[in-house]
Amino acid sequence: MSGNSTQSTPTTSNSLPVNLDLLNHEIIACVRCPRLIAHCRKVGEIKRRAYLDWDYWAKPVPGFGDPNARLLILGLAPGAHGSNRTGRPFTGDGSGNFMYPILHKAGFASQPTAIKRGDGLELIDAYITAAVRCAPPENKPLP
């Protein structure tokens, strides 16, 4: 993230989406962890056979959903061929295939599937993010 993070920002609900949008742009542009950035890019170049025709996201994955949500879902890190490929948390992998139908049934998702960014999925009163924003090698972040 940029070095300007010491600025105070308004915390009213009206300003929250703007601040979250700014944070997500900073996350996407982040290059603080050379090991993780290199791994994300490498995975994006050396693709799984099933995804050879995909243009991998291959950069830090921002959060997704309703900025004023009452439900926060926190994952560990993006999957190398899931979120690192699609650019959206829990999208395009087994964990998303399990989670999104449940969220849809509970009224937190507009549809039961999550294939890629721009597929029409919207979260309702829910926000999904991860503790680590880049797919780590062997799915194991360092402390």
Model-identified regions with their sequence ranges:
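A polyanion-binding, active-site-adjacent surface
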Residues: 17-143
